[in-house]
């Protein structure tokens, strides 16, 4: 046996006798390399038995080198294998212990799949998701849901009423059925104004002899009117815009004014009238703009020039908050009341002077009440505290759950009419929530970011529910919510598609308009390459407005409509039947609105980069600079220069260019790098909120879209005043406006630049 083993071992190395040679590492003085040859003991025994003298044989160099090469190869293979194996074990050691080296390759592979916690579903692409969304929407009957929400079960549903709460609970249950990640409610205690159950609001003509001629005890009312009694001359002021008041040939000082509904909000009409020293306002729907058959139709609205609970300005209306009594500066100090067209025509019968042709108004319109007559207005509205509920459901993102898009709709309404005002938006909200729930649970859609669906109430009192939620999370919401999509009043007609949005969303909306087809003519919604110039500014009565102007969150609102206003909003005729009569293709129109909103949601939550085009504000800043350049002489006369404003605008342009370059150079698969870039993009809108005014005193701090002396439009208006009436111009105010606007723009540029060491400090 020993002979066989020795023979096999010997043959492995070419049949040569084995010897090991040790070479000295030190070079010998005489140039020789000494070595020691060692023979195996078995060889020595064999030589001794055969009585043969061992002779030293020189090993063959070729076979020796082959031996060392083989050994080296084996060693390197083992080192590489062990390094890789130990590295793998280290990665998964938290899950389970390393597998033994002796296990098969198949076992290693199967255990690798078990221990790696990586989603196995394939990622759907934009084209796949568009098709999937379209197919889902095709199977839904939106009109049935709108009809259900417009029935007596849920109407009338004034904010805080029993039927409003019943609808809130229904929506909450629906969200639970959709298997959302979380469903919750937000509770507030707010003060709203309602008609008195004791006294009536009244409009009366006071004859010269003191006799009273009753005109109307209106069914409708205007919330947040000053409850008081006034009497005076009555004059017409068209729509009640600032321009309308400026163009009047008679004074409104100490007079009641009557204005048409439309063009601007009730609150703006009242504020304008108050600024021209009017003592009260009457609002009606004229026949030309609102061709409604019923002349005695009542109208509802509110007069708060702001949003949220006006008795807790700047802070949320949570129960038992210990704030001192206060009220919003946007509340009017004069009474305001809506009247029917029949009542307005009765008043016109006592008035004189034809209305200007440029007003494009019906012939019954008159300008001033006859001499020796007055109109008496009595408003007896009362404040009520109501508990209101906002309902939320969230689909959490799979990569960045702490970043979310909010999709919301108002569910309440003043009066019995609810269809176009709140049922369409609420129905669309529910169906979109259902569609996205199905896409995730059944079709493999994995949004990177979260989607929050929100049902607001008290929207008819000035986006109270939405604003109170924003006020409750003012310090943190802008760091997490990056877009608000408003679904209110999305279908009022078929002819036009109108958009109101933050400039950050213009580019994305343009792409979606090119994708989505109009259901009537089959053409793209993108009809005009110059559509951005026709984008309308968000109004006070739009729930998207406080998101943009108060919280600095990009927001978008859109609708299908006609050239003329929808005639039934704010009236009891806003019914499902009236809506389907005006919009026979209601189901197709709402489905198209759902496709627009759905594509927005997908693009904002699916793509690696946030689809917010921060470069669009470059054109807005450039437009502002052009407006300001018209007053270069005035500015120079005050010893001022626009140099620093130019510099701030230039820094913003350079910051956007650098950010675009950073994005193009970034490794898109590196989530940490992309998150850092997206965080910089998210800061843009928020940093356009002026940091130099109080959110309590001036809640709408956005220098482009806000309201107050800190806005860029107010700065320009101040310069116009200097040219018109220099004695009324406040130079100190203007200097502050210019300085603070400059530093606000510079702050946005700095935020876009990223880390503090990347900011150009040579301002």
From Swiss-Prot:
Keyword annotations from UniProtKB, A to Z: Cell membrane, Disulfide bond, Endocytosis, Glycoprotein, Lipoprotein, Membrane, Palmitate, Phosphoprotein, Receptor, Signal-anchor, Transmembrane, Transmembrane helix
Motif (Cell attachment site): 649-651
Domain PA, chain residue ranges per copy: 225-315
Post-translational modification, as annotated: Stearoylated by ZDHHC6 which inhibits TFRC-mediated activation of the JNK pathway and promotes mitochondrial fragmentation. Stearoylation does not affect iron uptake. N- and O-glycosylated, phosphorylated and palmitoylated.
Provenance organism: Mus musculus
Name this protein carries in UniProt: Transferrin receptor protein 1
Gene: Tfrc
Family to which this protein belongs: Belongs to the peptidase M28 family. M28B subfamily.
InterPro entries attached to this UniProt entry: PA_dom_sf, PA_domain, Peptidase_M28, Peptidase_M28B, TFR-like_dimer_dom, TFR-like_dimer_dom_sf, TfR1/2_PA
